[in-house]
Each structure stands twice: as structure tokens, then as C-alpha cells.
């Protein structure tokens, strides 16, 4: 195994982590730098497969509680957006009400992260970008779904509450 000098794996299924450790532990004595961290149980993988904040779990400066809260905020935001989009399925929808509900969803999303950050100030540049990109993806998907139902909402209307309220 002359070509392999290091093997670092993180956040992988627990059974895979165990198998890799077992297979390569003999190579450590031959100079292999082996690091297997954050083995994940099937339950964790199921719950976090689609969670864009799953990388927060285990980051040095982010508590497990804040990682879980971020995942919960994401789930609540998706549910709220789906609720808004669903209102357009029956035909005529009150566009102003839809805009207000989306605005409220963005406000709740933003305030949830503000509240989390107020306690410990853990949100740094990378997390700021992740929070914004997750919201951007959710709103872009909502906008596309609304447009397919004949409802057009300006991007600025969707993002304004985030920019106005964000403290982190």
C-alpha cells in the first residue's frame, strides 16, 4: 500500500466506518495516517440526508443543540413554504396573502438564526453564507412552483425580510 499515505473520512455510516477501520488498521504501523470520525447511525442518516445544515453537527464552534435547531428551522421553513404553494393548487389564490405568508416564513427563519446567534455568536462567515444559500434555494423552489401556478412574486419581495432582519 505504498501509494496511500492518508485516509480521512468523516460523517459516514457507522458500519462503513467500522469496516474501513478494521481493513486499514494494520496499515497505520506502515505509515498510513488514518482518521475516521463522526460515524453515523442509520437513524441520523435518515433524519439528516436532506438537511443542508447536517455539516453543522460536529463543527468545532457549533453545539449539537444549535445544529439540531438549524435542522428544525429548515424543516419548519419547508413545511411553511409547502403550505403556501399548496394554496395555489385549487386555482385562484390571494396573491397578497401568499406574499404575506412567505414574508412571515422568511421572518421566522431569520429570527430563529438571530436568536441562536445572540446567545453564543457562533455564526461566522461560512454559516452566514450557508444560511443565506439554504433560504435562497428554498425561495427559488417556491418561486418556480408558484410561477407554474400562475403566481409571480418578485425576488426582492422574498428576500427583503431576510436582509432587513438579519443580525448575524
Predicted regions and their residues:
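Short, solvent-exposed, charged loop/turn and helix-capping segments
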Residues: 86-104, 112-131
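Alpha-helical repeat scaffolds in large eukaryotic proteins
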Residues: 75-89, 107-118, 136-143
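Amphipathic alpha-helical binding modules
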Residues: 28, 33-42, 121-168
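Generic alpha-helical secondary structure signal
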Residues: 15-18, 22, 100, 129, ...
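Short, surface-exposed amphipathic charged segments that create phosphate/polyanion-binding patches used
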Residues: 22-24, 48
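Concave beta-strand-loop units of leucine-rich repeat
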Residues: 1-18, 26-38
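Short terminal alpha-helical segments
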Residues: 31-90, 165
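Residue-level detector of well-ordered alpha-helical segments, enriched
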Residues: 69, 73, 101-108, 131-134
Amino acid at each position: 500500500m505504498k501509494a496511500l499515505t492518508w485516509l480521512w473520512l468523516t460523517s459516514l455510516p457507522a458500519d462503513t466506518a467500522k469496516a474501513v477501520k478494521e481493513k486499514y488498521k494494520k496499515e497505520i504501523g506502515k505509515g498510513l495516517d488514518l482518521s475516521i470520525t463522526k460515524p453515523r447511525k442509520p437513524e441520523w442518516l435518515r433524519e439528516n440526508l436532506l438537511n443542508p445544515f447536517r455539516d453543522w453537527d460536529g463543527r468545532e464552534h457549533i453545539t449539537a443543540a444549535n445544529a439540531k435547531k438549524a435542522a428544525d428551522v429548515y424543516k419548519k421553513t419547508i413545511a411553511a413554504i409547502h403550505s403556501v404553494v399548496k394554496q395555489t393548487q385549487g386555482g385562484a389564490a390571494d396573491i397578497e396573502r401568499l406574499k404575506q405568508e412567505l414574508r412571515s416564513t422568511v421572518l421566522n427563519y431569520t429570527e430563529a438564526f438571530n436568536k441562536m446567534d445572540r446567545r453564543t455568536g457562533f455564526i461566522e462567515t461560512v454559516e452566514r453564507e450557508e444560511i443565506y444559500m439554504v433560504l435562497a434555494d428554498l425561495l427559488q423552489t417556491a418561486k418556480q412552483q408558484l410561477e407554474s401556478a400562475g403566481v409571480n412574486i418578485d425576488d426582492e419581495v422574498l428576500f427583503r425580510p431576510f436582509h432587513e432582519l438579519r443580525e448575524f
